[in-house]
Amino acid sequence: IVKRFAEYFCEHIISGINFSVDGKKVDPVDPLLWNQKGTIQEYGPLPVPGYPGITLKIADVLNTEGHKASYQKQGGYVFRCNRLIVGSLVNGDKITGFWNVDPHWRGVRWQLNYDASHDVDLGTTTRKDDIAPKQELMDKIREIVMPIARECHRREKEQGIIKTKDQTEQLVKNIKSVANDPLITRTISSKGAL
């Protein structure tokens, strides 16, 4: 329950409201890692054009300190009245025109915040735990998110190539180091003599 509270009410906790469960203080779990070292705050929080009261922010969390960008946590997060109601949105039943779950997009996160006055625009369910947004609104969000997401994706791929090259160079150094180790050389020589 503490983990759920930390995720669902992270915006309230970040704003200074304290929660505790069985006497244990609940720390926020912000899916955008907005204020963490290494997070690139790409956009926002800014209003979605034509929808005052709906704000959007986008982050690149690939190099966020102490966090490995999770494959499953990529995509969008929707908060109603500062409470998370839907997370990890990618192409699927609720939204289209974004990206499918892919390791090269794992660092891209976006967050949509809205209040109860926009329940119709977001198609908020009566239980306030899911959405079926209007296509016009999703088109506007996509127009903002996707160019930034593509740039994050490009950086991710470049960084992956660089890492791969660096990792290969390190592997070669390790092999050379092992090959020149006198103890290993003697062991190989003695086994060869058998």
At which residue positions do the language-model features occur?
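Active-site-proximal acidic segments at structured loop/helix or strand boundaries
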Residues: 21-45
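Charged regulatory segments coupled to nucleotide-binding catalytic modules in large multidomain enzymes
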Residues: 38-194
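ATP-binding catalytic core of ATPases
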Residues: 1-24
